[in-house]
Swiss-Prot record:
It comes from Saccharomyces cerevisiae (strain ATCC 204508 / S288c). Its main location: nucleus. The keyword NADP does not apply. This is Meiosis-specific protein HOP1. PANTHER family: HORMA DOMAIN-CONTAINING PROTEIN 1, MEIOSIS-SPECIFIC PROTEIN HOP1.
Length: 605
């Protein structure tokens, strides 16, 4: 009889990855990703690159290059500095913009876009999203689409993740990234690159990375994707080290292959919207117990899938589809949530969209023939800054028209009256300040300087606390002093009033185009009034300078009698209170600070 001695297996001990190691590994992964995509997408000549191998085990003390199989490593391409100004610029974006922002823990996402002519019309996009955890208690996983998830019995909060574990995750992620990128359609010879950065709530208001400029309120960059897109094809995966978490996705508008497949239905997607919607879904998942499952797909894949599936029934070729969770049951193009008491809801007869009455002139009936989108067509981007300005001015004016007792006691009270608190941010305040500037320019508002307003026009006089900056008197180019009270007059029948807020409803694309051009021109005037070169001063109440622009004789402008809208039996203006029940009080998306590269990178060889 033989005796076998039982030997207790040796327990493997791991040294947890440090924050510094995690930072360096994240930078290595980004550098490899940029090098590989630049090579595989033909952005630069071959002599700009150098071959390297990423070996996860290289950090081990007993690492021996001779004993390491190539199967345990991955061949990658990296960019060389000093051989191309364009390649150097790409590396500068990465090192001076991205790496610094990650160290400050303020970068939420970076979007590297490839385009042909218009930097907001992307042909291809690579998006990286970032999360940070100071308490080191984040679940660890490599979320590659279609791969099995780890054991459900493990306690990820107590699991130690070493540097080697993290490097192996990077290797898996890079392999999938290379496979996906290799499968994309070839790009045209001449193309351009732009980088956008979206920041989280930790960012300093004045922070601006080198080589970047603010683009928070610029037109968003979007990508046209087919409604029958294979969702798994866009997601690369997620790296989580307990210190940093980064997810990578690829979106490509390879129109040639789509059209060959007979697909003519598309939607336009803002890559950053996927990140923000993913954030909301994560919050929901935290409150719902997870069901047993053998396979998982990434959050980005799920979000895009929901977006595509929700648009199948009514999608039109190259139609922009609004997927706006902000307004709940109301899908008004203004994109803001309005308090229940501020407006009734109207319906567009053409597209059945639900709209805010104050955005559509407090129209008498419960439905309108066509909304802005139906009139203008699918090329209207409701996220255009000029369009958002237009809707804000119309909203403010119509709210003031129905408020018989005069202007609210303060600018903040005005904003509170027609915009839900959750939607109030610096962008909203700035647009309201611009709206008031337009009203002062048109003499719809007139500052009281001791004289009497016109006897031929009916005014409502109010004392108002100015508690929002940026309110400028046009002809003097002087800002009203914040936290000071002023008296001014409001009228609905100024002969200089602009038609884009006086008209109850739009009636043609040409008219809307004209309105948007008027907004653009007025924005330039407002910007000049705010610029340092204008030598802005605080307005002195005792100043003898005129506060109204002179009316130029000989100019005729349509005169509007808005008193007809105040007749109790005819108009919804006075009785404009919401009657809808169970209004969806969904949490609105936040406005994030966004920066864009000052220069675009040209690739043509």
């Amino acid at each position: 009889m033989s005796n076998k001695q039982l030997v207790k297996p040796k327990t493997e001990t791991k040294t947890e990855i440090t924050t510094e190691q995690s930072q360096k590994l994240l930078q290595t992964m980004l550098t490899m990703s940029f090098g590989c995509l630049a090579f595989l997408r033909g952005l630069f000549p071959d002599d700009i690159f150098v071959d390297q191998r990423f070996v996860p085990e290289k950090v081990e003390k007993n690492y021996n290059k001779q004993n390491t199989s190539q199967n345990n490593s991955i061949k990658i391409k990296t960019l060389i500095r000093g051989k191309s100004a364009q390649a150097d610029l790409l590396l500068d974006w990465l090192e001076k913009g991205v790496f610094k922002s990650i160290r400050l823990k303020c970068l939420k996402a970076l979007s590297l876009g490839i385009f042909l002519e218009d930097p907001t019309d992307l042909l291809e996009n690579y998006i990286f999203s970032f999360d940070y955890d100071e308490e080191n208690n984040v679940n660890i996983n490599v979320n590659l689409s279609g791969n099995k998830k780890g054991s459900k019995n493990a306690d990820p909060e107590n699991e130690t993740i070493s540097l080697l574990d993290s490097r192996r995750m990077v290797q898996q992620l890079m392999r999938r990234f290379i496979i996906i990128t290799q499968s994309l359609e070839p790009l045209p010879q001449k193309k351009f690159l732009t980088m956008r950065l979206m920041f989280n709530d930790n960012v300093d208001e004045d922070y601006q990375p080198e080589l970047f400029k603010d683009a928070t309120f610029d037109k968003r960059a979007t990508l046209k994707v087919p409604t029958n897109l294979d969702n798994d094809a866009i997601d690369v995966g997620t790296l989580n080290t307990k210190h940093h978490k980064v997810a990578l996705s690829v979106l490509s508008a390879a129109t040639s292959s789509m059209e060959k497949a007979g697909n003519t239905n598309f939607i336009r997607v803002d890559p950053f919207d996927l990140i923000l919607q993913q954030q909301e879904e994560n919050k929901l998942e935290e409150s719902v117990p997870t069901k047993p499952q053998n396979f998982v797909t990434s959050q980005t894949t799920n979000v895009l899938g929901n977006l595509l599936n929700s648009s199948q029934a009514s999608i039109q070729p190259t139609q922009f589809v609004s997927n706006n969770p902000v307004t709940g049951i109301c899908s008004c193009e203004c994109g803001l949530e309005v308090p229940k008491a501020a407006t009734v809801l109207k319906t567009c007869k053409s597209c059945r969209k639900t709209l805010h009455g104050i955005c559509y002139g407090n129209f008498l009936h419960s439905s309108i023939e066509k909304c802005f989108t139906c009139i203008f067509g699918p090329s209207l981007d409701t996220k255009w800054s000029k369009f958002q300005d237009l809707m804000m001015i119309r909203k403010v004016f119509r709210f003031l028209v129905r408020k018989k007792k005069g202007f609210p006691a303060s600018i903040t009270e005005l904003i509170d009256s027609f915009i839900n608190v959750e939607d109030q941010n610096n962008e909203v305040k700035e647009r309201v300040a611009f709206a008031l500037f337009v009203f002062f320019l048109d003499e719809t508002l007139c500052l009281d300087n001791g004289g009497k307003p016109s006897q031929t026009i009916r005014y409502v006089t109010s004392s108002v606390l100015v508690d929002v900056k940026g309110i400028v008197i046009p002809n003097t180019r002087k800002q009203l002093n914040v936290n000071h009270e002023y008296k001014w007059h409001f009228t609905t029948s100024s002969p200089k009033a602009e038609s884009f807020y006086q008209e109850v409803l739009p009636n043609s694309r040409k008219q809307v185009e004209s309105w948007l051009q008027d907004i653009t021109n007025l924005r330039k005037v407002y910007s000049e009034a705010l610029s340092p070169s204008s030598t802005l001063q605080e307005l002195d109440l005792n100043s003898s300078l005129p506060t109204q622009d002179p009316i130029i004789s000989g100019q005729k402008r349509r005169r509007y009698d808005l008193d007809e809208y105040l007749e109790e039996d005819k108009s919804s203006v006075v009785n404009d209170t919401i009657k809808a029940k169970d209004f969806d009080e969904s949490v609105p998306a936040k406005i994030r600070k966004i920066s864009v590269s000052k220069k675009t990178l040209k690739s043509n060889w």
